[in-house]
């Protein structure tokens, strides 16, 4: 069975693993997921990510994300929400880019220049599809 929304699947896996205090989470690999992981790493929400090559019995590459926790196991990732969905796409012009929690969070935007945060997109004056909010 095919997956309808792989980005929502990734965000749900991250949210669930974070709530359960797992150190790492594994999911099927795709370029867009790797780009989202790179944005999350650059913003300090995850420690690192890597791509595992498939074994004999496993089909396809796997994306492994190492979650980040502070001292006393405080979560770095407080919340994550999918905005644009396959049934209802959400686009924003460069002047209308959303702010998450008044600038404390990050909106991940898919632009013609790749995946950017809302701050980067505002700085470059580009709009695009609002994929997710992270705080």
From Swiss-Prot:
Gene3D superfamilies recorded for this chain? 3.30.1370.30, 3.30.1490.10
Q: Which domain of life is it from?
A: Bacteria
- GO MF annotation terms: rRNA binding; structural constituent of ribosome
Kindly list the biological process annotations in GO that this record carries: translation
Q: Which SUPFAM superfamilies match?
A: Ribosomal protein S8
Q: Does the keyword Cell membrane apply?
A: no
Spell out the GO cellular component terms annotated for this protein, sorted alphabetically and separated by semicolons.
ribonucleoprotein complex; ribosome
Looking up PROSITE patterns in the UniProt record yields: RIBOSOMAL_S8 (PS00053)
Q: Which UniProt keywords apply?
A: Ribonucleoprotein, Ribosomal protein, RNA-binding, rRNA-binding
- Report any Pfam family annotated for this entry: Ribosomal_S8
HAMAP family in the cross-refs? Ribosomal_uS8_B
List the PANTHER family.
40S RIBOSOMAL PROTEIN S15A
* Protein's UniProt name: Small ribosomal subunit protein uS8
Organism field: Salinispora arenicola (strain CNS-205)
Q: Which gene encodes it?
A: rpsH
